[in-house]
Amino acid sequence: MASSTTNNPALDLDSDTPENPGHELAQFASGCFWGSELRFQRVVGVIKTEVGYSQGHVHDPNYRLVCSGTTNHSEVVRVQFDPQVCPYSDLLSVFWSRHDPTTLNRQGGDVGTQYRSGIYYYNEEQDCLAKKSKEAKQKEFKDKRVVTEILPAKRFYRAEEYHQQYLEKGGGNGNKQSAQKGCNDPIKCYG
């Protein structure tokens, strides 16, 4: 991570780079990051996923602090992908399919600003595609407003290790779920 360009590193843009120069990064917030991460893990062309916190104002947050509602961070999945195999538009389709983008600061029983809907982009092309996809999604909802925010990706703070690939590792009850590419098994989210 480069040095801070503001007085608060949490407000800086995410300057991390993919491990391979031909790959890209993307950040998505769609409620609890466990189920979202597993869905992205299954996408052909996704090289790596990490869950963490972004878009907040507190440097080096942790899960307990984010859940307190005082940091303004979102729970996000950061995806490293090969755009030659998996176009960004495919990731947007996965994002929209994983949650209700019309509920503000909640997904199901999970309530709080950390569960808001957001697309956090790394370049102008991602910004443009995200906005077009939101416009298309809004047409599907006649009487509801899509509340998904689309903003530049701020610094990514990797969540605690036990959150990484949580459902693939068995979650809270030891029932491992497949992260195999192309898997369409239902995703069961449990703590």
Curated annotation (Swiss-Prot):
InterPro entries: Met_Sox_Rdtase_MsrA_dom (IPR002569), Met_Sox_Rdtase_MsrA_sf (IPR036509), MsrA_MetSO_reductase (IPR050162)
One biological process term in Gene Ontology: cellular response to oxidative stress
Region (Disordered): 1-20, 168-191
Keywords: Oxidoreductase
GO cellular component: cytoplasm
Entry's Gene Ontology molecular function annotations: L-methionine-(S)-S-oxide reductase activity; peptide-methionine (S)-S-oxide reductase activity
Keyword Magnesium: no
Top-level EC class: oxidoreductase
A matching Pfam family: PMSR
Catalytic activity as recorded in UniProt: L-methionyl-[protein] + [thioredoxin]-disulfide + H2O = L-methionyl-(S)-S-oxide-[protein] + [thioredoxin]-dithiol; [thioredoxin]-disulfide + L-methionine + H2O = L-methionine (S)-S-oxide + [thioredoxin]-dithiol
Signal peptide positions on this chain: none
UniProt key word Membrane: no
Listed EC numbers: 1.8.4.11
Function as written in the Swiss-Prot or TrEMBL entry: Has an important function as a repair enzyme for proteins that have been inactivated by oxidation. Catalyzes the reversible oxidation-reduction of methionine sulfoxide in proteins to methionine.
Family as reported in the entry's similarity comment: Belongs to the MsrA Met sulfoxide reductase family.
Name of protein: Peptide methionine sulfoxide reductase
